[in-house]
Amino acid sequence: ALSCQDDDFTQPVISFTASSASVNTQYQRRDQHLRSKDFFDVKSFPNITFQSTSLEPNHINGDFLMRGILGIRGIEHEMTVDVEYGGTMTDNEGQMRCGFSLYGKISRAAFGMTWNRPLACGGVLISDEVRLQGNMQFILKQ
């Protein structure tokens, strides 16, 4: 959901809730493991949440930096994501739409997801750093 206190989009609030069981890597065995207690523990923690706290212009590239609180497995941490504004348009039905792309990184261990497996050649199977990417489209509510 997106809400704004004003028409010029200077103070937007973005929040979302996603089902942790909706994880889909296109590989069923891996998805089942990701839904287990080793990772998302979807039976105990069915939702992933995000609530923005601020949106500021990114003077480096002209887009935005959004700060907010991400909740996974009942653990909340502040995070910052890069936001690219994709544009605004009126669709064929006369509805105003705007699009955004989001990019960020988190530590999965910070959210209690520490499972890993050592590799024979050294190192571990899974990186702690997880890159997040998402696309959003909003429709102006009349």
Regions found by a protein language model. Give the residues of each.
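Low-complexity, acidic/polar, glycine-enriched regions of mature
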Residues: 1-142
